[in-house]
Each structure stands twice: as structure tokens, then as C-alpha cells.
């Protein structure tokens, strides 16, 4: 915002709100003819803002894919419909990764824009690790398994808890920290209670300081059923944190030697054994391989910046 940007709040994107959301978008574009590019990041649901943008005559309309499947919830059929209609309202296709682009657009015309983060914000810091653990009442000797993400079907929290239960049997002095909220939160909390080890599972809700938790974790867990290129996986690698991903997470997320991909066909016990064998004895505060990564915002922003300049030139040429 320091560069002059503004934030506008649209109605929440719930099914009962779709007509209200679309009308709000129509009015917004009417009131703000100065905007010549609309860049939407809500996957199949991008159909709604881009349809309103097309109606308003906005020349550049970008849909940006961040996922490789659609949650099988009550909105599933509607999202599938919007996905099929999306190409009728967009002018350009962007994606965080190849698999995500293939899924949403079903062609090879999309532009790859890597998910990028401010790498320095996540570099490992022993003092932050100790501080976070102290505030949570976790000793320096305790093994901390961490997960950050929306509590929803795609993140596979039931299996995450099963893995932790098996791991806890191997390494009793361990805890699972779950950061995030979502539509399955109560169901997953109840499942954790039934596991018999819920005293060692902590639900921390949404946080605005997640960069500190990568320091406190010993491993990051993403046993997802589907993903785009997950930002949490990128952030964790900048913190030199060992990561365990399911095979459903695109391998393009990996840029450090501490990423591990395990099949969801393997049992929770097999996952637990793999995690128990990981070396957590040393983490670097800064590694040259990470500095050079495409996911570092200091280099990756140039890709998006150059693309925007290219699109503005298209507009000027008419």
C-alpha cells in the first residue's frame, strides 16, 4: 500500500452471495474505468469477476490457476460449470505451475508465474525457534510436526492425524501443530479427540506470524489429496525445514534437498517411519541454493512485472 495501492472489499464469495458478488463487481468496474487489467486468482471462480470485467469492456482479463483439482464439496458442480465457461471470459491464462495450468485451462497456452515469497523473512533463526516454543510450552527436545493450511478436504487432515499417531508411537516426545481454519475444522478436531493423543495435537487457528512457526517446526507436513504449487512448501524450504509432501503435490515445488515425496498409497505407519529417519540436527540460516531459487520474490517479481509491461503495450497498440 506504500506505493499507492488500494484495497476494496467485495462481498464474500458464498453460493448464496454469487448474484450480490457479481452485481458488486459490475458496479465496481463502472465506477473505476481506470483499471485496464483484471487479474483473478480464484481458480474456476474467476469466471464471475472476469465475466463482469468483460461486460465492462476491460481489455485484459487474466485467470490465474493455483490448484490441481476441485474440492468435492457442495460447490463442486458449480465450480466445474464455471471452469468450463472460464475461457469465454478470459483473455490470458497464468498458472503457478504446469500441473495447475493443465488442470484449469486444459491447454498449453498459459504463462508460468512462480509463487514467490520474501525469502529473507523465512530464513532460519534459532532465537525465534526458542521463543515460539517457550510461548507454547514446548521444550527444545520435543519433536514438532507442523502443518499450515486451510482445514478442508484437499489437505487430508484425517490422514495427517493418523500419521502423527503412528509417529507418536515411535517418538513419544512429539507434538503436532495445526495452523489454519476451515469448513472441516470441527470434524477434524473431533477426529483428533478420538485419536487418543489429542493432548499432543494443538489447533492454533489463523495466524499472522506463520514465518515464526517454520522456525519452531522440525518438519512440515502436506499429505494433500491435491495442490497447486503450495506457498507453505516454498516458505518452509527457505527456512531450511525438512518437508514431507504427498505425491499429489507437484514436484516443481521442490528446490532444496530437504523435500520428501511419499505416496498416499503408503500407510500412515510407513509415513511415520520415513519421518522418524529425517535428520533434524542442523539447519542453515541462509543457503546459496535457496537464494538462487525462482521462488525468491527478489527475482521472481521481474517475471510478472515484464508480463504486465507486455500487456500494457498491447493495450496501447489497441
Label each PLM-derived region with a short phrase.
Residues 8-9, 88-128, 301:
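Donor nucleotide-sugar binding/catalytic pocket of nucleotide-sugar-dependent glycosyltransferases
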Residues 14-20, 102-107, 116-135, 140-142, ...:
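Acidic anion/phosphate-binding donor-loop and adjacent secondary structure
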Residues 40-46, 65:
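Short His-centered aromatic/hydrophobic patch
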Residues 121, 282-318:
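A charged, aromatic-enriched C-terminal amphipathic alpha-helix characteristic of glycosyltransferases
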Residues 143, 147-166, 183-189:
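A conserved mid-protein helix/loop that constitutes part of the nucleotide-sugar donor-binding site
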Residues 188-205:
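Nucleotide-activated donor-binding/catalytic signature segment of Leloir-type glycosyltransferases, i.e.
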Residues 206, 225:
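Aromatic "clamp/platform" in nucleotide-sugar-dependent glycosyltransferases that forms part
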Amino acid at each position: 500500500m506504500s506505493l499507492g495501492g488500494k484495497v476494496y472489499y467485495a462481498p464474500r464469495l458464498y453460493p448464496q452471495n454469487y448474484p450480490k458478488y457479481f452485481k458488486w463487481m459490475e458496479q465496481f468496474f463502472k465506477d473505476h474505468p481506470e483499471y485496464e487489467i483484471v487479474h483473478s486468482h480464484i481458480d474456476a471462480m474467476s469466471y464471475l469477476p472476469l465475466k463482469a470485467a468483460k461486460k465492462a469492456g476491460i481489455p485484459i482479463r487474466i485467470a490465474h490457476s493455483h490448484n490441481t483439482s476441485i474440492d468435492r464439496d457442495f460447490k463442486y458442480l458449480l465450480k466445474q460449470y464455471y471452469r468450463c465457461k472460464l475461457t469465454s471470459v478470459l483473455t490470458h491464462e497464468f498458472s503457478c505451475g504446469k500441473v495447475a495450468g493443465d488442470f484449469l485451462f486444459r491447454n498449453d497456452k498459459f504463462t508460468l508465474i512462480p509463487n514467490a515469497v520474501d525469502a529473507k523473512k523465512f530464513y532460519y533463526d534459532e532465537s525465534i525457534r526458542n521463543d515460539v516454543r517457550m510461548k507454547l510450552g514446548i521444550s527444545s527436545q520435543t519433536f514438532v510436526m507442523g502443518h499450515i493450511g486451510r482445514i478442508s478436504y484437499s489437505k487430508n487432515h484425517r490422514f495427517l492425524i493418523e500419521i502423527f499417531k503412528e509417529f507418536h508411537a515411535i517418538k513419544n516426545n512429539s507434538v503436532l501443530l495445526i495452523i489454519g481454519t476451515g469448513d472441516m475444522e470441527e470434524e477434524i478436531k473431533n477426529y483428533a479427540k478420538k485419536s487418543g493423543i489429542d493432548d499432543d495435537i494443538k489447533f492454533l487457528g489463523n495466524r499472522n506470524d506463520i514465518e515464526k512457526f517454520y522456525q519452531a517446526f522440525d518438519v512440515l507436513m502436506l499429505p494433500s489429496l491435491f495442490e497447486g504449487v503450495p506457498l507453505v512448501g516454498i516458505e518452509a524450504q527457505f527456512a531450511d525445514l525438512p518437508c514431507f509432501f504427498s505425491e499429489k503435490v507437484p514436484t516443481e515445488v521442490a528446490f532444496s534437498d530437504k523435500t520428501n515425496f511419499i505416496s498416499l498409497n503408503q500407510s500412515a505407519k510407513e509415513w511415520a517411519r520415513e519421518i522418524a529417519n529425517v535428520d533434524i540436527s542442523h539447519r542453515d540460516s541462509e543457503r546459496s541454493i535457496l537464494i538462487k531459487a525462482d521462488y525468491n520474490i527478489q527475482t521472481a517479481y521481474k517475471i510478472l512485472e515484464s508480463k504486465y509491461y507486455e500487456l500494457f503495450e498491447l493495450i496501447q497498440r489497441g
